[in-house]
Amino acid sequence: MILKRILFLFTSVTLLAGCSSGRAPEIRAICLRDDIGNYIIKWETDPHTDGMMKLYVSDTPNSFDMSRPCSYADINDGRVTYITNDNITRKYFLLSFNDKYYRTVGARSVQMDSVQNLRDIGGYFSEHGNRMTGWGKIFSSGELKALSRNDTIRLDNLKIKTVIDLR
């Protein structure tokens, strides 16, 4: 009888420990721009996570006003759209999953009138997943000549300090 109770207790503790491992879910997120400049943010969690996703927006990737989410979504929806009329200032987004797990994203491609393929190389994790290239720190692009007025403003807003032409 005592052996049965010990076995039951051991089995219960083992099962409960497995269910509440506390392991953070892997969060994969991407930010895209639609044809009119709105931001579409998509995400997946592994393992599957239920609850609420809060979306915060900022002009910089490291400073978000956590008292004012701009949007809410059910985590299971897997997407939210941020509507903007500002196609000059670049936006970054902080996704908060149940106020416990966080992921910062931005649109990788920067919309320009006369520059092809200007991309933010931030947001990539190291091989072991413990370090990430900072958003808004390194960009790649095609030629930067003959910029339109809006492109000049957009580049100024990116606060690029050094341009290296590798051609």
PLM ranges: what are they?
Residues 1-5:
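Positively charged n-region of N-terminal signal peptides that target proteins for export
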Residues 6-15:
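Sec-dependent N-terminal signal peptides
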Residues 19-167:
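Cys-dependent protein tyrosine phosphatase-like superfamily
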